[in-house]
């Protein structure tokens, strides 16, 4: 049976043509992003263990991660963590597997602890996963009959939920600028040049006509600045980096950058952290409260509210459909001549094959506001079918970490 793919003209103005556009990104060290990353790290490690030990990825969803902020006392030139950050991983995990030789237990606890601590160790320079963080877990336990799974296995996994996936292409100028601003501040090159720049960077972009204002919350590592003047110099260099980036991404816009607008330097009120993240002192986080699958929060665009991070990469459509919707939109924009803007939505039905959505809704804005032609519709339908035919390939990409969901 043919898939239900509906292609229509998008009746609204381009985002770039709106008077006002708003875009946000919560960076690597933001508490919400830490939760997304921890959830995804655990899912990947569980998937790898299941594959290596049992030959297939078993059921798990660890998309409920909570971070409770600690307490710290940063000061110019130093500081200390007084109360560690607490990270709780929760969800559902297959903990026992019945095989031909009996029941085998899965070392879920060590896998979870190792995944989260390794992620912190690999991505933070001043946050010690042993000294500054307590990692805990509370997971619903389940068992599975491996023989029965292989005997009943369908070629295409069945959706384990009824969900919506949403994606769009291309990114607007503001979206690209916000995304790349956080990335450049958290790049290896910037950390070597400006080691005082912490990992907790949040970027809020506001475009009003041809004017863009970037408000950047940038944690500064207290041990790397010995005075207020050192701190201000770091801010100035970071601003220069961002303005240089903006001159390449948004050359036709007047761009202003405001970093740490809550600072009162004359009173030594500065955004200082011991570890590089605000999570050290009372800023809490949770999975799904931050960036969408494309790495951005875009209130001017249709968005899914699913927390993709930590969901299993085999049949949880809350994860897979959001990834696929963005991929489908990007391909349509790139390959179909005359397409200016694309919005894709996928709707699943629980228990149905994931390559057979209940509906695929594609809205396209053609150049010049023209109606979408019959030829363009056929091309778009062919791309949508091709992406869905290869949907199971996204599982491996997610497990390898080739695709990020935050």
UniProtKB/Swiss-Prot annotation:
* The protein's annotated pathway: Amino-acid biosynthesis; S-adenosyl-L-methionine biosynthesis; S-adenosyl-L-methionine from L-methionine: step 1/1
Source taxon at top rank: Archaea
**Names of the cofactor(s):** Mg(2+)
- Protein residues bound to ATP: 140-145
Q: Which UniProt keywords apply?
A: ATP-binding, Magnesium, Nucleotide-binding, One-carbon metabolism, Transferase
* Task performed by this protein: Catalyzes the formation of S-adenosylmethionine from methionine and ATP.
What's this protein's name?
S-adenosylmethionine synthase
Protein source organism = Aeropyrum pernix (strain ATCC 700893 / DSM 11879 / JCM 9820 / NBRC 100138 / K1)
Q: Which gene specifies this protein's sequence?
A: mat
């Amino acid at each position: 049976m043919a898939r239900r793919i509906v292609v229509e003209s998008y009746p609204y103005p381009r985002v770039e043509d709106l008077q006002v556009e708003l875009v946000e990104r919560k960076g690597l060290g933001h508490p919400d992003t830490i939760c997304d990353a921890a959830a995804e790290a655990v899912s990947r490690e569980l998937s790898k263990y299941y594959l290596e030990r049992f030959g297939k990825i078993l059921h798990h969803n660890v998309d409920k991660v909570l971070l409770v902020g600690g307490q710290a006392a940063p000061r110019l030139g130093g500081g200390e963590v007084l109360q560690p950050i607490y990270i709780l991983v929760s969800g559902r995990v297959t903990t026992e597997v019945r095989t031909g030789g009996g029941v085998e237990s899965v070392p879920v606890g060590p896998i979870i602890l190792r995944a989260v601590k390794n992620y912190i160790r690999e991505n933070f320079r001043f946050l010690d996963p042993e000294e500054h963080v307590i990692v805990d877990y509370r997971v619903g336990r389940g068992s599975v009959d491996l023989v029965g799974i292989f005997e009943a296995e369908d070629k295409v996994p069945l959706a384990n939920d009824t969900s919506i996936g949403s994606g769009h292409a291309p990114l607007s100028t503001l979206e690209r600028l916000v995304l790349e601003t956080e990335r450049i501040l958290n790049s290896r090159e910037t950390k070597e040049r400006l080691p005082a720049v912490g990992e907790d960077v949040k970027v809020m972009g506001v475009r009003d006509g041809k004017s863009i204002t970037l408000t950047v919350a940038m944690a500064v590592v207290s041990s790397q600045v010995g005075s207020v003047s050192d701190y201000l110099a770091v801010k100035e260099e970071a601003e220069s980096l961002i303005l240089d980036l903006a001159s390449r991404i948004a050359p036709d816009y007047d761009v202003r950058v405001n970093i740490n607008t809550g600072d009162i330097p004359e009173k030594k009120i500065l955004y200082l952290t011991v570890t590089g993240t605000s999570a050290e002192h009372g800023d809490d986080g949770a999975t799904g409260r931050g960036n969408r699958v494309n790495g951005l929060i875009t209130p001017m665009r249709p968005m899914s509210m699913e927390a993709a991070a930590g969901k299993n990469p085999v049949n949880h459509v809350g994860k897979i459909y959001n990834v696929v919707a963005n991929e489908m939109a990007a391909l349509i924009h790139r390959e179909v001549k005359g397409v200016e803007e694309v919005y894709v939505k996928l709707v699943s039905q629980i228990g149905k094959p994931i390559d057979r959505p209940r509906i695929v809704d594609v809205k396209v804005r053609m150049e010049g506001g023209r109606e979408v032609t019959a030829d363009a519709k056929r091309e778009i339908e062919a791309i949508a079918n091709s992406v869905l035919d290869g949907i199971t390939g996204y599982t491996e990409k997610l497990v390898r970490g080739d695709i990020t969901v935050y």
